[in-house]
Amino acid sequence: MFARWKEWLSLEGKYGKERIRAKYYIINRSAGGAGFFSNYMWVLGHVILAEKLGYIPVVDMENYPTLYSEDTPVGGITNAWNYYFENVGEATLDEAYKSGKYILAPDRPLHKYEEKYCKGDYRFPTPDTVRYYAPVIQRRLRIRKEIEQEFTENWKCQVKGTDGVLGIHVRGTDMKNNLGHPMPADVTEYIERAKRLIATHDEITKVFLATDENNVKEAFEKEFANTRVTLFMNQAFRIWDDGAKKKTGIHETKVANPRPLHKYLMGKEVLQDAWFLHKCDYLLCGHSNISNVAIMWNDNQYKEIQCVEGRS
């Protein structure tokens, strides 16, 4: 009880009191952030607290750059959050700072606000989680219209109205290092589970695969060649699994000759993968923020979700 009271004083108590003088709540992550959807969940938790206390939330990924921040503006934009998303509140970052009436958010994840009703490992969403967060996401964490339109057109190029789509997310790279993440299952387990789902549901005619490893991509291409289903993927930067337990994710991989705007494109590619996953009829996934967010975006419309538990 004392610990909960202490936590309340350091968060709701402290920042509720500051609301007397401050109007804007500036969300930042000073350590440079982590994976794309780790940052997304960080922002989501802080947005919910800001709303609760009556602040206008603003995201600062300009003065607090992330792994996806470029050294030069992207389309004239210098705040990496706005590369991909609309403002989370009714003000720009510049307006918030110039007002002088702002407070910096605590530089930590707000687990009590970003894991509501979740269960098991890695805040896996339940239907109650989705019902709680979907309205906030639709209201505050909106993808830029031109990007969502591009994703929509790309989806329509692959999927027709009668297609039933199984979405599969296989996360590799740093998820295999056992450093705070649930260990993923082997790719053969995903393939076997996918086969069973396809055999059970005749309506599945397409399989969308999202993965950060070329090994996984090739394994699925080999397994589902010349079958009744069509496998498709988005173009994205992927790496080869050399068997080493990587301490960094694909978003931190050093590239010898990076393409122009590589960091920005890394974010856009994982965003499109999650967006495609949320459009699918069925989902097969492990524990990761990407699949968690896809489930919340899907708004309880999946016909079936199967989570492949990893190795202990």
Describe the role of every protein-language-model region.
Residues 1-2, 269:
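Short, intrinsically disordered terminal tails adjacent to the first/last structured region
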Residues 3-206, 217:
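Secretory-pathway glycan-assembly enzymes, especially type II membrane glycosyltransferases
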Residues 51-63, 285-286, 297-312:
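Gly/Pro- and small hydrophobic-enriched strand-loop and loop-to-helix capping segments
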Residues 52, 191-194, 232-236, 308-311:
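Glycine-rich loops and low-complexity Gly/Arg-rich segments
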Residues 171, 212, 309-310:
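Cofactor-binding loop segments of dinucleotide-utilizing enzymes, especially the Rossmann-like FAD-
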Residues 205-302, 306:
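Donor-binding and catalytic core of enzymes assembling or modifying cell-surface/extracellular glycoconjugates
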